[in-house]
Amino acid sequence: MSARVVSLNLHERHGVHPRAVTEVRARSGGGIEGDSHVSRDRRAVLVLDRSTLEALGLAFGDLREQITIDGMPEVSRLAPGTELRIGGVELRVNGECEPCTHIGELNDQPDVEAFRVALDGRRGAVCTVTMVEGPIRVGDVVDILVRA
């Protein structure tokens, strides 16, 4: 089974729950147009596998991921430099998103430290869009182009 995009979310402002959309436009050298992280060079896009959300009883966007995929549970463990193609867009993995207590606060967790520990190794991959930009849509296939 191929991995596929199952949810897309835009963070239009910090501190506000992201808005679900069916299509986004990825911008070379950064992230997703209309997202508050678009100009970041190393932490522009968070890609997360649905299995993490399901294991923790969370909904799409709760971990502030822009792209939720299904079928690649190892996405959090992809080495920096790994290249992904989502639809026609290419992204470079810059590393794992380190769990913090802030995400627990955003999700009203009663024990933010326990929530942080539960996310260890499952928080997703932080990425940057490389030279190939364009649209990403719910349903797009996700492939690993180059493993680092």
Task: Give residue ranges: language-model regions.
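Metal-cofactor-dependent catalytic cores
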Residues: M1-A148
